Amino acid sequence: MQYDQIIDISKWDKVKNDAHYLLYDEYYRASKKSVKKVVYYIDSYYERMEDLNYLGYTKNVLFKNSDLYTISNLDTLISANVPYKKAKKYLAVKGAQIQDIKKYVDSGLSPLKAVLHVSYPGIDSSKRDDRTYTIEDPANMLVLIKNGFSVPSDYVPSDLRDVNIPYESEVGQLRDEAATALEKMYKDGLKQGYSIAIKSSYRSYDTQLAVYNEYFAMYDAAYAASLVSIPGSSEHQCGLSVDLTSQSVMNGEYGTFGEAPDYNWVEQNAYKYGFILRFPENKGDRTGATNEPWHFRYVGKEAAKEIHDKGWILEDYIEHHGFAYNLRLN
C-alpha cells in the first residue's frame, strides 16, 4: 500500500522534509503540533533513533510526552548514556530536569528526593542556587512562587473576582476559591468580635513592577530585595495571596495588623479556611522574605492543615511532597 493511500502526503510536502511520512503522521496525532514543527522533530529524531532505541527511548515513550523529550533533551539523554529503564522513575517526578538525569541516578536517593536535591536546592532560600525556573502551571493551588520560581509576565488567573469583605483603599480580588474562603473567615471572625479587611490582594505583573521600582528608588538594592518580590516572583500575581488589615487598625486603635487582636485570631484559625501565614517570624532565611504578619496565602484546607499541624512553611510542604506541576529551566 502506498503512503498516499494511508495519509495525506501533500500536507507534509508543503515543507522540506526527509519523507518519514508515517512517523510524521503518528507524531502529529500524538503531539498536535504544527506541520513545520512535526517535520523538524521527526527528521531530527530519525537521525538519533538508533542511539535512542538502544537506550530504550522508543518512539512510544517519546511521543507520549513530546514537551519533555525535545531534540535538545534527546541529545542530553544520549550523552548521559542512562537507559530508560533506570531513568523513567526519575523522569516521572514532576519538575524532573533531563539535563540532571545522570546526577539523579548517581545520587542514590529516592526519585523525589533526587529531583529536589539536585535540581531545586533553591526551594530553601538559605541554599545557593543560580538556576531560575518558570512555572508551567501557575494556576496550581500549591504553586511555590518566590525568587528563582516565577510565573509568566502575562499570567492572569482566569477566575479572579472581587472579594466581598471590607478593604482599606480599593476592592480586593482573589481567585474564586480563595475569595470564598476569605469571605467565610471574615464572617466567622465577625461573630467573635474580629473584623478583618483587605489591604492588598491580586496584583498584575505590571503593578508589581511599579511597586518593585518604587522600593528600589527609595532603598539600596539589597534591602529593597528583602522587602519586595521581583516581578513574576510575587505571590500576589497568582491571585491566592492577601495582605490583611483590620477595622481596628483602620480606626487608628492599633498601628499595624500584627499588633491587633484580629491578627492573633487569624493566625490561629486561618488554616481552617485553607490559608497559611506565608512569611512567619524566624523563617526568613528559608522563605527569602522578612516576617510579614499580614501576608496570608491560600493553599486549600488539606495542605493548610498539614502545614499548620506540623509547624511547616510552604517550603517544607514542597520538600516533603514535591511539586504538583512542571517547571521549565530558564
Could you describe each region identified by the protein language model?
Residues M1-S200, Y205-N330:
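Extracytoplasmic cell-surface/polysaccharide-interacting catalytic and binding patches
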